[in-house]
Amino acid sequence: MPTINQLIRKPRARLTVKSKSPAMQNSPQRRGVCTRVYTTTPKKPNSALRKVAKVRLTNGFEVISYIGGEGHNLQEHSVVLIRGGRVKDLPGVRYHIVRGSLDLQGVKDRKQARSKYGAKRAKKAA
């Protein structure tokens, strides 16, 4: 245990917290251009074809981000908005693409949790 004098000379080091989404640079969202849109498989024990896109951001970072929801209209050179948030079963995917913003359309025929997928409210059938 250090003496008070030792602590005055050299205070205790503060623990630095490492960012889980460094490419965001403390922004809530970032804009970028898709450089590659493809599917990848999750790690064990899950099995699927997850839709992901490699995105070059306006700040120069190139990140892999997840495209949530059923179906999408993304292709190379699409402009997208990304937010933080990893996908647990896809290593290296630390960002999500925001649905219904810029070039990415919302999920069609979505009834529940619509705001998460950029879906407008359905018209009431009279």
Curated annotation (Swiss-Prot):
The keyword Transmembrane helix is annotated on this UniProt entry: no
InterPro entries: NA-bd_OB-fold, Ribosomal_uS12, Ribosomal_uS12_bac
Pfam families in UniProt: Ribosom_S12_S23 (PF00164)
Modified residues (3-methylthioaspartic acid): D89
GO molecular function, one term: structural constituent of ribosome
GO cellular component: small ribosomal subunit
GO biological process terms held by the UniProt record: translation
CDD domains per the UniProt record, alphabetical: Ribosomal_S12
Coiled coil region boundaries: none
Family named by the database record: Belongs to the universal ribosomal protein uS12 family.
Assembly mode: Part of the 30S ribosomal subunit. Contacts proteins S8 and S17. May interact with IF1 in the 30S initiation complex.
Role played: With S4 and S5 plays an important role in translational accuracy. Interacts with and stabilizes bases of the 16S rRNA that are involved in tRNA selection in the A site and with the mRNA backbone. Located at the interface of the 30S and 50S subunits, it traverses the body of the 30S subunit contacting proteins on the other side and probably holding the rRNA structure together. The combined cluster of proteins S8, S12 and S17 appears to hold together the shoulder and platform of the 30S subunit.
Name of protein: Small ribosomal subunit protein uS12
